[in-house]
Regions:
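Flexible "cap/lid" loop of the alpha/beta hydrolase fold
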Residues: 92-96, 100-134
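A short loop-to-beta-strand scaffold at the N-terminal edge of the catalytic core in hydrolase folds
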Residues: 1-7
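Conserved serine/cysteine hydrolase catalytic core
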Residues: 166-217, 223
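Gly/Ala-rich beta-loop-alpha elbow adjacent to hydrolase catalytic centers
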Residues: 82-86, 90
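Catalytic histidine-centered segment of alpha/beta-hydrolase-like enzymes
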Residues: 227-240
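Conserved alpha/beta-hydrolase catalytic His-Asp/Glu region
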Residues: 134-187
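Active-site loop/oxyanion-hole signature of alpha/beta-hydrolase fold enzymes
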Residues: 31, 38-81, 241
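Conserved HGGG/HGGXW glycine-rich cap/lid loop of the alpha/beta-hydrolase fold
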Residues: 7-54, 247
C-alpha cells in the first residue's frame, strides 16, 4: 500500500517526494502555500518502506519510480518536487520511461557524490536488524536526529507520529532499514534521461551537496540563503517561489 494524501484544486498536480528516512509530513508548509496561492493540487506520498506505506521486497530508484508512476498515471499536468532521494525519483519519472509525462522537476538537495565507503556503509545499514525503543518519546527523538530534522521540527509536531510505529516488541522507526539499498544510484544517468531539464535547489549550508557539484549537471541551480539540507522544511516560501518560475501554462 502506497500511502498518500491529496489537497488543493485544479488540473495541475504537484507530486511531493520526500527524502530517505523522512515522510510526507515534511511538505506540510509547502502544501499550505500551494493552497493559499491556488497553484493547483498536490499529492504527498510516504515512499515505500517509510511512514504509513508498506515495505517492498527490494528497493531501487527505478522500483520506487514505478510504484509512484502508477499513482499519478492519470494526471494530465504533472510537476514533481523531490528532496534528496525524492529528487532522484523525480528525475527517473521525468525520463518518461514509466508511462507518464512530467512537465517539470524541482530537485532539492540531492547528494550527487558518493564515495565507495559511503555506499558500502549505507548498504550495511540495509542489512541491520530493526532497533527497538521503550517509549514513543525515545524513538521520536531518534527519528528527528537521523532524519536531520532535529532543529527544524518541534517535538510536538503532529505528523511526527507517522514516522514511528508500535507493536508487541516495542517502538521502532517506521522506516524499513532495507530502504538504504537505494544509495549509489547513477545520478548523471538520471539527469541525462530527464525530458524536461530539471531545476536544482540547495540550502546555503547543506553539507551533503555543494553548489559547484550541482552546477556540473545544470545551469539552473538556486542556492537558498540561511538554509541547510532540509530547505523545503526551513523555507517553504522560497521553494514556492522556485515552483512559480516553472512554465505552469496558465
Amino acid at each position: 500500500m502506497l500511502w498518500h494524501e491529496k489537497g488543493g484544486s485544479g488540473k495541475r498536480a504537484f507530486l511531493l517526494l520526500h527524502g530517505l528516512s523522512a515522510t510526507s509530513g515534511v511538505w506540510s508548509g509547502l502544501e499550505s502555500l500551494i493552497d493559499q496561492e491556488g497553484l493547483g493540487r498536490w499529492v504527498a506520498v510516504d515512499l515505500p518502506g517509510h511512514g504509513r506505506s508498506t515495505a517492498r521486497a527490494e528497493y531501487s530508484v527505478g522500483a520506487l519510480a514505478a510504484d509512484l508512476a502508477s499513482l499519478v498515471r492519470e494526471e494530465p499536468d504533472l510537476f514533481v518536487i523531490g528532496h534528496s532521494l525524492g529528487a532522484y525519483i523525480g528525475l527517473a519519472l521525468a525520463s518518461h520511461w514509466f508511462g507518464i509525462v512530467v512537465r517539470g522537476v524541482l530537485a532539492i538537495g540531492p547528494k550527487v557524490t558518493w564515495s565507495t565507503a559511503e555506499i558500502q556503509s549505507a548498504h550495511q545499514l540495509a542489512t541491520r536488524p530493526v532497533r527497538w525503543y521503550t517509549s514513543a518519546e525515545e524513538v521520536s527523538k531518534h527519528y528527528r536526529r537521523v532524519s536531520g530534522l532535529d532543529e527544524q521540527i518541534a517535538p510536538e509536531e503532529k505528523w511526527l507520529c507517522h514516522s514511528v510505529t508500535h507493536c508487541a516488541e516495542g517502538w521502532r522507526l517506521a522506516q524499513d532499514p532495507r530502504t538504504f539499498e537505494v544509495v549509489g544510484a547513477p545520478f548523471s544517468t538520471l539527469v541525462a534521461s530527464a525530458q524536461p531539464p530539471a531545476v536544482f535547489a540547495r540550502g546555503e549550508h547543506d553539507k551533503l551537496v555543494s553548489e559547484s557539484e550541482l552546477q556540473l549537471y545544470s545551469h539552473q541551480v538556486h542556492q537558498i540563503a540561511g538554509a541547510g539540507h532540509n530547505v523545503h522544511v526551513e523555507k517553504p516560501a522560497e521553494i514556492l517561489s522556485l515552483v512559480q518560475t516553472f512554465n505552469l501554462g496558465d
